[in-house]
């Protein structure tokens, strides 16, 4: 680290003729002229370093092979037990699209005290496209039964000692608890099956010490495949059987993790009553990085018995699963917050990140060279890799890379005899230094070794912003900005001078031919006739649906997904049902024009909260870039410069515009219902609405708290609601709107009462709607029935029906999905129209 933190030095920096700024790692900034420079140094850079999110590799949980079938591929081998037996099972099954497997281990305490929230959590997972496989425990219940029978409850290293008398009681208790979960799921409308035996094959672990406790040697997945085929949630008890048919007890944590090794689920969730894993002070640990913390944790005096067993099994499991796999420990009522909120309240256990230098025994030269090609765009052996290999062996240059080979660097001595190294080049898997936090782990590795310095063109705003976050000091100038780490203050002056004198990169000296095209030009050339779009505010429920629809679009490519909360993380951490290597960027108002240019963006989806998007739009208005903008907030629904994005009634105007104000969710239903009768109203119509709690967003609040909403609805903002003002403005006629939140997850129902100028019959009303929305595939007119929320949930359509007429009094019931036609579907319709594409591309396949 920098020493002499209170000492100031002055230096003359040549070739920089304008006012410069210097920043130290205590965040103080000193202005200085080109002839006199004051550089302050100190400590604190490590407080800026965030934990790295691992690169997500493709997970083989469900692979679609046709519209009506899929293949579930389980791992071909497992490890972690002494007697390892090959496990191989593959079966083609009929399965719904978007289904991804999540392994859920449920503690016995949850079954006993919080089964209602538990069932809500499992149903929530299914709602967002994740299919749970449940493994349950029953420790508290078994202990109670043993006490009643006069049997002692004994444990050795966290494992229950199981003599024949205990095993007999355990089988009865586990069956009872299994059926509790199954029956509760069935009562909630979710199909479930008990799987009490037949999944685990085992041998006795140590009969003299543990009795009838098993060591899992094989996983049988026939029962699981059968359940998934028929859309049943399998509920598995932690009992195994020997090849000869002897029943053995398996610790539920061990059972769940052994199953995870074999099926490689998209996510692993441990649901317990403590909402996480607690440390010695009784506080929940938010993150555990096993590669970094395991050895120290196992030495802690509070790590014993069950906790010690958990950590041991967590490591055994994560060591054999893809590096991106994590285990989330939370409670039923906090599951949604843990999955979606910025500050989850449970514990996330990850394998962590290991860094390699080119001198490390595990350094993979081939993978590192592939990373260079991926990052620099070199093809056909233009870089002389044999020369690079030789120079690495001689120490002419040094290489550092993360264990997933998604981020790396080349460094070389700043000058002969210098203790400071010059960072010659950065390499990133997806060609964007700003779109990954892997670079932070690379720098952490650098900090452990020596002092480093590098420079960047002052014009490269995106890179400079990133480097400022990870450097202990920097100076900015008209031509170049200089960044450094861990340089003593008495060496900074000379180091800066020597850094400025570096004229070319190492790779440029061993490259046979270089492309003259810029990165953005090459990107535009390689677009393959797909329009490139970006999504700002890419998190939560609406963002997930937009990402999914874009992912399945034949003519669109999601080039950027921006989220300040998730910056650098794989997009699958927010939307686990997707299969994508994309990582979150952090697009800001001051750099959206640069992102637009450098990434060849044809259109932006702005999924930001109200009153946030304007600075982004102002930057684009002041630049030469003119992408299509579809804003899902309410910011521009009252702005005449923007086009109201209601395709069924405003298609021609949308086609000629690049600024689209996407209608609100409730507003879509009210507008479409009232539009055919807007000229026939005597008084303002009254609109009573109930929305699912997903409409309150993924940030926890009373309006999306399932406990508060249980057997309840919550009215809110009953006058002057934004959607009331929006629809009144767009119709040119006032309305009244009374919104409520219900206990269901997604969907909207509206009951709208209108007083007309003249009497009408039901037949006349139905005919009016049918003519008005003829040839509109997303508008359904139900002339005889009453639309229900559950019938329209998960669909792209609006259903108008429930017609009740009494003279000139008309009541209409309308339903729609607030996340789809009320948000993502309509936004995609608008983007398709603006780009000249099929309006229903990526939508019609799901109708």
Curated annotation (Swiss-Prot):
Organism: Dictyostelium discoideum
Alphabetized SMART domains for the sequence: Semialdhyde_dh
Region (Acetylglutamate kinase), start-end ranges: 100-331
Keywords linked to the UniProt accession: Amino-acid biosynthesis, Arginine biosynthesis, ATP-binding, Kinase, Mitochondrion, Multifunctional enzyme, NADP, Nucleotide-binding, Oxidoreductase, Transferase, Transit peptide
Residues that span the membrane, as ranges: none
A GO CC annotation given for this chain: mitochondrial matrix
Keyword field contains Cytoplasm: no
GO MF, one example: ATP binding
Pfam families, per the entry: AA_kinase (PF00696), NAT (PF04768), Semialdhyde_dh (PF01118), Semialdhyde_dhC_1 (PF22698)
GO BP term (any one): L-arginine biosynthetic process
Localisation: Mitochondrion
Organism placement in taxonomy: Eukaryota, Amoebozoa, Evosea, Eumycetozoa, Dictyostelia
Entry similarity comment: In the N-terminal section; belongs to the acetylglutamate kinase family. In the C-terminal section; belongs to the NAGSA dehydrogenase family.
Alphabetical list of HAMAP family matching this protein: ArgC_type1
Protein name: Bifunctional protein argC, mitochondrial
Annotated InterPro entries: AceGlu_kinase-like_sf, AcgluKinase_fam, AGPR_AS, AGPR_type-1, Asp/Glu/Uridylate_kinase, NAD(P)-bd_dom_sf, NAGK-fArgBP, NAGK/NAGSA
Active site: 665
